[in-house]
Amino acid sequence: MTPETDALKVQILPKHQSLPYTVTKAKSKSLILLVVVSVTITLGLLLYVFNSNSVISSGSLLSRRCKLRYSVLIDAGSSGTRVHVFGYWFESGKPVFDFGEKHYANLKLTPGLSSYADNPEGASVSVTKLVEFAKQRIPKRMFRRSDIRLMATAGMRLLEVPVQEQILEVTRRVLRSSGFMFRDEWANVISGSDEGIYSWITANYALGSLGTDPLETTGIVELGGASAQVTFVSSEHVPPEYSRTIAYGNISYTIYSHSFLDYGKDAALKKLLEKLQNSANSTVDGVVEDPCTPKGYIYDTNSKNYSSGFLADESKLKGSLQAAGNFSKCRSATFALLKEGKENCLYEHCSIGSTFTPDLQGSFLATASFYYTAKFFELEEKGWLSELIPAGKRYCGEEWSKLILEYPTTDEEYLRGYCFSAAYTISMLHDSLGIALDDESITYASKAGEKHIPLDWALGAFILDVVTPNSDYNGKSRKYLGF
């Protein structure tokens, strides 16, 4: 509180004013002394008030620094492993998050942990490097009070459980010796629906809609490497196996969330190429056209350099496939992939395979590979789906040699896949999920909100963990932070 003081008032007589009596020399000195003392006291009080405000301000900053807490989360994805280092604090009993550079840092290393299926011990190298990165951003005195977790996603979900556990045990060994607070159960493979929920939390936290009317929230459609997630609040009845309920503040949200495993960009492309290769075996010359790869591409040229485990064995396709980029044919081929198994649908709505999907409603953010594809083609954020079709047609129909020259700074691994990505995006969002091409309620994004918070599911996992450290979510006990 700022001290309240009344300024001292000192009356000084005008220099030429006639006095009714004679002022003695002693009295004159006393008056001068009084003035000096009064001015000194006034300046002293003003200085005290100024310093008090400075101390209060500095004290608040120091208090926040003293209360700063840290959390480390390692996202073990299909194409790479990324560490997130979070700094946060509490004010009035509520957590305060700051995802700016001062209190948040991340680093990604390739390849993903799933690529170590044949050599689990190899996973320790990248995890150790990520732990060292985290240590450089957290004060040493806070190590024992800072938790570290590892959450693996679709790439690991595709592996057999025994192989998953072998890789996880290697990572646990590294995390146990990290110096951070860790428990073995904090390194695990999360479900696809959980991943979708975390992404939804990140987006709605960034947009400021957490804690508001559920139907005013924003949905997420996310295209990863091994899986695709669809997550939103639906007014329809959702079967319990497809719904999750979370609480934020005083509001409960019942959310449709599903992860379409094997329908991520890399996994779907691999599946398509394998289907084409199998069909080539039944042709006279043993060769079939691949409509999703630009003409002139040689399949075994760059496969050894691919960071994605899904395309690392591309050289096996040489001789059976001929690149013949054609957007319309690629769109048809990818749509056929998405319809497989639909005849087994037991629900009213099955947009992809035999999986229940309610009609999409409200606004949506298209993230991950949806974003990268739209960004590559420099599409407008509104109505971008309608622009993607002509852009995809031009790109797919171009010669590979010309594309390399046109995009010299783009990694050939990604350049080779944009024809497929463009067609697959239209097949999934428009042909399967029913989003109109001119629908402006869906935008592509990698960040959201006034603070441009990254749309990364790991941030949502961190937020939910801090907000509800002791609650039970999806049948799994949340960890206790230890403070």
Curated annotation (Swiss-Prot):
Regions annotated as coiled coil: none
Names of required cofactors: Ca(2+)
Record topology, Cytoplasmic segments: 1-29
Residues in compartment: Extracellular: 51-483
Active site residues per record: E195 (proton acceptor)
Gene Ontology CC terms, in alphabetical order: membrane
Subcellular location: Membrane
Keywords carried by this UniProt record: ATP-binding, Calcium, Glycoprotein, Hydrolase, Membrane, Nucleotide-binding, Signal-anchor, Transmembrane, Transmembrane helix
Binding sites annotated in the UniProt record for ATP: 72-82, 219-229
Entry's transmembrane regions: 30-50
InterPro entries reported in the protein's UniProt record: GDA1_CD39_NTPase
EC number: 3.6.1.5
UniProt main location, coarse: membrane
Loss of function: phenotype: No visible phenotype.
Tissue-level expression: Expressed in the initiation zone of lateral root and in the lateral root tip, the adaxial junction of lateral shoots with the stems, and in the abscission zone of flower organs. Not expressed in the rosette leaves.
Family assignment from sequence similarity: Belongs to the GDA1/CD39 NTPase family.
Protein function: Catalyzes the hydrolysis of phosphoanhydride bonds of nucleoside tri- and di-phosphates.
Protein name: Probable apyrase 3
Name of the gene: APY3
